[in-house]
Structures are given as C-alpha cells and as structure tokens.
Amino acid sequence: MPPFFSPYGIDAISVSIPYWLDLLTVIIGAISGILVARDRHLDLVGFVGLGLLGGLGGGLIRDTMMQQGGVYMLNSPYAIPAAVFTAVLLFMFPEPLDRFPRMLEWTDIISVGLFAVVGTDKALVYHLLPFSVILMGSITGVGGGMLRDVFLGDIPRIFQRSNLYAFCAVAGTTSYWALVSYVGVTKIWAAVVCVAITVGLRRWSLKFNVLSPADIDLTPHVMRRVNKLRRKAQKPGKQPEHNISSK
C-alpha cells in the first residue's frame, strides 16, 4: 500500500502521476463515449469517434489551453490506440454493455473524477496559479463529455440543469489541489479522494434530486426592495433646524 503522506512534502508536486493511471483514465473515458454510441445505435465510425472524444477530448482541450508539455494524445504511443481498440472491441462484443443498464451513469462520473485528477496534476506540475489549476482540472473532467454532446448535436450536459454535474468536477479538482499542494498527501491517495468526492457528490445529488439552479431572475425582488426604500425616503419628515449664530 502506498504511503498516505509524501516523504518529499509539497516538492512532490513536480512529479507526475503514474502513467498507468493516465491510460486507465483514457480507457474509462472511452467506454463512457462508447456507451452513448451504443445507446444511439451508431456504426463503427461513431463508436471510434465517441470513444476518442470521451477518452481524449478533455485532455485535448486542456493541452490546447495550457500550451505546455505537448499534446498528450499525440505524444503518447498508447493513448489513441487504447481508445480505438476499446471502441472496436466493444463494437464487436457489445453484450457486456447491455447487461448493466446504469453503466453509462457510473462510467461517466468516474471518468469525470479521473480526468479531473490528470488535468489538475498536469497544471500542478507546470506550476500554474491556483485558479488556473482548478480550471484546468475541471475542464479536463467535463471536456470530453462536452465535445461528445456537441458532436451529437446535443446541448452539453454541463450547460443544462442537472444533478451537480460540473460542480462535482470542481469539487474533486479542488480537493486534489488542496491535498497535494498544502497537506502533502501522495498523489495516488489524493486521486482516490478526488474520485470519491466527485462520484459521491454526484450520487448524493441523484439520490436526493439536488439540481443546479436555472431560470433565476432576482430583478423583481430587488426592484421591490429598491422601490420600498425609495418610498420610505420620500416620506415627509421633520426638517432639521439650522441655528445660525452671529458672532
């Protein structure tokens, strides 16, 4: 079992997470896209396309914005082949996907948590500012799903009223950043906490039907308060007396 606290403290920020975790994240993200392709009855091209978007889309957006360290999907010898192989394999043998009707729901949010880890970690390795770190982690977490929805002609889920979908990514990203940067927790355990928070918040919001707010208009409430204060200020009152004393 890996140690919980890093013996190097926050100096371990500059050490990237294990490569196998990157690859596992790509595969799970690809499966989430493939499940949507299966649900939409797409052909092999659709399976491969959504597998690539789900597995590599978030990282592509992150790397394009950061412009540091190269583009992971192009530099890695395994990322694209892993996503394509997973898509082709599940296209030919889709029965395991059909056995679990809620598999999409689980793989989708787990992939968000894992992508939040790798996105936050790369931003930490290149010493970005805290808000930039959280932004990169969150975008990496939801970016693949966003591109998938756009390519399917749907409104991305992060822009719709949902069960705290994007908020889960922000919360997981923030936890990873704080644990690694300030507490000195090893990156493996920080990743476990990040995924647990992301998945846990999502499951909690689904269980209790907690939805992100939408169609809010505070204008009438604010205007009523303003009008009330204005009427109160306009009421006639006793004018203060000004005593002018002559010297």
Question: Locations of the language-model features?
Answer:
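Helix-coil boundary and interhelical linker segments in multi-pass alpha-helical membrane proteins
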Residues: 1-15, 64-74, 118-132, 178-189
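Structural signature of hydrophobic alpha-helical transmembrane segments
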Residues: 14-26, 71-85, 129-142
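The first (N-terminal) embedded transmembrane alpha-helix
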Residues: 19-32, 50-53, 172
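C-terminal ends of transmembrane helices
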Residues: 30-40, 63, 88-101, 146-157, ...
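Cytoplasmic-side transmembrane-helix entry/capping segments in multi-pass membrane proteins
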Residues: 45-53, 76-81, 101-112, 136, ...
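Short, structured motif recognition centered on aromatic/hydrophobic residues
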Residues: 49-53, 60-66, 135, 139, ...
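Small-residue-rich segments of transmembrane alpha-helices in multi-pass membrane proteins
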Residues: 51-57, 107-121, 139, 164-177, ...
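Short, highly charged, low-complexity non-transmembrane loops/tails of multi-pass membrane proteins
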Residues: 213-243
